Regions:
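Beta-turn initiation residues at beta-strand->coil junctions
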Residues: 1, 9-13, 19-25, 34, ...
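Surface-exposed acidic, glycine/proline-enriched linker/cap segments
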Residues: 1-4, 77-113, 310-327, 403-424, ...
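Glycine-rich, acidic and aromatic/proline-enriched surface loops and short helix-turn segments
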Residues: 13-14, 206, 244, 401, ...
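Repeat-solenoid scaffold signature
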Residues: 23-110, 242-299, 330-384, 442-483
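Extended repeat-based solenoid scaffolds, especially LRR ectodomains
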Residues: 92-178, 305-321, 326-331
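A residue-level detector for well-ordered beta-strand positions
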Residues: 9, 30, 55, 119, ...
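Intrinsically disordered, low-complexity Ser/Thr- and acidic-rich flexible linkers and loops
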Residues: 1, 219-231, 385-386, 411-418, ...
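A motif-centric feature for acidic-aromatic and gly/ser/thr-rich catalytic loops and repeats
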Residues: 1, 305-311, 536-595
Length: 595
């Protein structure tokens, strides 16, 4: 029982955690130096790969290098080697050469390490080691210089080298520049795939940004950029604040388009957002709260949502006083009211939906749990002349990990959570507890990177997805393709889009999203600029969000109603009721959804 459900921690004589065991995972080992700095770490997947994660610090205790070493020494050996040594390093710059990237290697760990993130502080001498960094740029209306030798950059992060986990030889080179008050006034990035992003910032005397200029250079242009000043797109924001320092107006300019008042914000007496006027004040959104500050009503263009707790409840709703939502209604869902019931541990045990006249819609959901809070059963009903089960799902666990899910009813509905009972064990996990096989979803294998993010997903029908992450966790690209029958799918080798079976790629570079080599979307705080219809040019699209942050629709300047077809609708439990448009994958609670 302890091995299945327990969280186990082991400590050395100096009360440092040297081993940790989590449910469903192999142990994680930790190694420290004499100064109590964590210098090595190894989880279950690291052991299988024969590597240790390495952490190197300067003499001020700042982490300067994180990477891995391909040497699978036993845990006890590394403890013995490191525990009496001070393994801190310091920056010597170009005078020390490019060895260890300007830092002094003081131990075999430094020599063996393949770096994934390199941090530079205090000064800009690192630019003499790497030619890929972009220096300080001058733009009219923004700072024309930075303070390289001033005390203002002391203890500041001035540069970063961030590796692409799929191929650590490809890296982002990011530089940060500061003014005399230590405020970041400019950052430049030369990305692993060749994109370039520059950000320029002006501040008021209180330290709040009043204007931000973002420049972007694409890798999909017809000719290479002539210089670092040759950019493709410019996105400029201007900010105004009220007497309390709250954002009151947000202006935006995209390329050569006219400046637009994206949003005007108004607040109530206690500082809560009360009204929002968008796109040159042509559309109004209002927000209401109860005496506890909980949101009770959201009014957007073409969407009204009401949230109930313990007051003004519709019929058949049970009042709740602990912050749980008793029910809510949304005009996009035909003003149906969704009501919730919870157990004594605040777990959702049932949902019911009602029409405005109080009659029940036959889409109830029921849930049961085990003592650990794991979902054991899920029943869902729909009405087709008479009530029928859409799902009657039973889930079996080993510890807290799903091993098998069986559904007694199989519906043709797209999101009916179909669980074909194909084999005795549908789901498998790796040594870190990551899902590596799910036969219910035709997932044959998933390969993960060093930070436990999926790198390759292979499906049993020959389809393949490859994800590209930077070492700091940013997703920058995905590639997709289909392998013909009989073709071996090499999970460890599919790391670039030169593979003959890769049919397309998508790129993310900060605010810019590219699909198959074409700029498709530019995000901004209240929506996005759509470029799918090139005949119309850039098209502003504002989004309407519900109480959980999911996008329920969008509207364009001149619209009087909400377009909702690309965006998700879902059951009260959150299970989707329709497909999500692949061009808007982040519509569901801000999380990426792929199908």
């Amino acid at each position: 029982e302890v091995q299945l459900y327990g969280y186990l921690y082991y400590y050395d004589e100096r009360d440092r955690c040297i081993k940790k065991k989590l449910p469903g995972c192999e142990p994680i080992y930790y190694v420290y130096d004499r100064c109590n700095y964590l210098v090595l770490k190894q989880d279950g997947n690291d052991r299988e790969a024969g590597r240790w994660q390495s952490f190197q610090y300067d003499r001020l205790g700042r982490q300067v290098i994180w990477g891995f070493i391909n040497q699978n020494r036993p845990h006890a050996d590394w403890i013995r080697i490191c525990k009496n040594q001070n393994l801190s390093i310091y920056f010597r710059g170009a005078s020390y050469g490019s060895e260890n990237y300007g830092y002094t290697p003081v131990h075999r760990i430094s020599h063996l390490c393949t770096p994934l993130i390199i941090n530079y502080y205090d000064n800009y001498e690192y630019t003499t080691i790497f030619n890929e960094f972009i220096g300080f740029l001058n733009r009219p209306g923004y700072y024309s210089s930075f303070f390289a030798s001033s005390l203002t950059s002391r203890d500041k992060l001035t540069g970063q080298v961030v590796a692409l986990l799929n191929d650590p030889s490809k890296r982002d080179y990011i530089a940060y520049y500061y003014d005399q008050r230590g405020r970041e006034v400019q950052s430049t990035m030369n990305s692993a795939f060749g994109f370039r992003n520059y950000t320029f910032t002006n501040y008021d005397f209180t330290g709040q940004p009043v204007s931000v200029r973002k420049e972007h250079t694409s890798i999909y242009r017809d000719t290479p950029p002539a210089s670092v000043d040759d950019v493709d797109h410019i996105l400029t924001y201007e900010y105004e604040y009220d007497h309390a320092g709250r954002l009151s107006k947000l202006y935006q300019t995209y390329d050569n388009d006219a400046k637009i008042l994206v949003a005007k914000y108004e607040y109530d007496e206690v500082g809560r957002l009360e009204k929002k006027l968008t796109h040159n004040e042509t559309a109004t959104s209002t927000y209401k709260y109860n005496v506890r500050g909980w949101p009770t009503e959201i009014n957007e263009l073409g969407m009204t949502e009401k949230i109930y707790y313990n007051e003004d409840l519709p019929q058949k709703a049970t009042p709740l006083y602990n912050g749980n939502i008793a029910c809510f209604s949304n005009s996009i869902d035909n003003n149906y009211t969704s009501c919730f019931n919870y157990d004594g541990l605040n777990r959702l045990i049932s949902t019911r939906q009602y029409k405005p006249d109080g009659s029940e819609i036959f889409t109830p959901e029921d849930f049961t749990y085990d003592k650990m809070g794991n979902l054991l059963t899920y029943y869902r009903v729909y009405f087709d002349f008479y009530p029928r089960y859409m799902n009657k799902l039973t889930i079996k666990y080993h510890g807290n990990q799903i091993q098998k899910a069986a559904d007694d009813y199989r519906s043709v509905n797209y999101y009916s959570l179909r669980y074909p009972d194909a084999v005795n064990r549908d789901v498998e996990y790796d040594s870190n507890g990551n899902l590596v096989k799910n036969l219910d979803n035709m997932i044959q294998r998933i390969k993960y990177n060093i930070i436990n993010l999926p790198e390759v997903v292979a499906f049993s029908d020959g389809n393949l997805l490859t994800f590209y992450y930077m070492a700091d966790g940013r997703k920058v690209r995905d590639a997709y393709g289909s392998y013909p029958a009989g073709t071996s799918t090499p999970l460890d080798d599919i790391v670039n889009n030169t593979d003959p079976y890769i049919s397309g790629t998508n790129d993310w570079c900060e605010d810019y999203y590219y699909g198959s080599g074409k700029l498709r979307r530019v995000t901004f705080p209240e929506g996005h600029i759509s470029l799918y219809n090139n005949s119309k040019g850039p098209l502003m699209q504002y989004v309407a969000k519900d109480h959980v942050g999911s996008i329920r629709g969008y509207w364009e300047p001149g619209d009087t109603s909400l377009g909702k077809s690309p965006y998700p609708s879902y059951y009260p439990s959150g299970i989707l009721d329709n497909k999500v448009d692949p061009y808007h994958p982040f519509a569901l609670g801000g999380k990426e959804f792929m199908s």
